[in-house]
Curated annotation (Swiss-Prot):
Role description: Cytoskeletal protein that is involved in cell-shape control through regulation of the length of the long axis.
Molecular function as annotated in GO: DNA binding
Keyword Transmembrane appears in the UniProt entry: yes
Low complexity: compositionally biased ranges: 176-214, 221-243
Gene responsible for this protein: rodZ
Listed transmembrane segments: 112-132
Compositional bias per record (Polar residues), positions renumbered to this chain: 161-175
Pfam family, one: RodZ_C
Top-level taxon: Bacteria
The family this protein is said to belong to: Belongs to the RodZ family.
Stated name of the protein: Cytoskeleton protein RodZ
SMART domains with a match to the protein in the record: HTH_XRE
Annotated compartments: Cell inner membrane
Organism: Salmonella newport (strain SL254)
Amino acid sequence: MNTEATHDQNEAQTTGVRLRNAREQLGLSQQAVAERLCLKVSTVRDIEEDKAPSDLASTFLRGYIRSYARLVHVPEEELLPGLEKQAPLRAAKVAPMQSFSLGKRRKKRDGWLMSFTWLVLFVVVGLTGAWWWQNHKAQQEEITTMADQSTAELNADKDSGQSVPLDTGAVTSQDTTPAQTAPAPATPVDSTAATQTQTPAPTAAATQNTVVAPSQANVDTAATSAAPAATETPSALPTSQAGVAAPAADPNALVMNFTADCWLEVTDATGKKLFSGMQRKDGNLNLTGQAPYKLKIGAPAAVQIQYQGKPVDLSRFIRTNQVARLTLNAEPTPAQ
């Protein structure tokens, strides 16, 4: 009778109450139980209060309760009914497995995306290369056109230069003809002398001899007078050279030094072309005209320009490798 009453009383007690009573009978504290089971004191307290922590799986909780029961000498079979209520087993949630075909489909999609990315990259690179080539070709054609124009202008200048000496020669021949025919007026004098004397033939021959002598003297005199004129001509050269060197003092003078072959065209404010053509390596060019100047340079890297005594910056054209087109303004004149 007493055994049945004790069994009913044990069934009435919960798992936590039975474990706490057994611990107290052994004289153990919650701290001692936690140290022996390697648990937290809060976990031991939750077990005795029949609480199931939300952050603790039911499998671990059932294991802790069994360890606690063995520690306080409580049969595990008596705690099984209470364990089902306090820590029921829960079915584990298993994530559905993805099929191999899904992964293959995703991999195929990623492959198409990568191929499209490479295609776009190749198109961009191709368009960039085509744009650069067209720009470079246009620059080369422009340089060739300007060079052809300058060559045509140089040929025209040569043709005009060859025709000028012909005119000069004609003028010279016209100028020298009167000098050579200047002694001609002496002939009427000879004829007059012949009619006045009316001497025999030997006398006339002597008269002719005397007439010829003055004509030779006149030719010698003309040659002698022409010689000082020829000697005086070089004395005028220093004056002309000084006149050519004088514009170098112009504050708007344009000085260019060439380190390589370069096509160049320089125009002043009046539209006059001061220079148009090809300059060779190590060449120098000094120009003077009415500012501002307009310059076209086929190879900016091959020329060094000084204007008003200061170097002209061509770095922006050199970096882009383009034909340089620039205008050099006139120097402001100081107030007097």
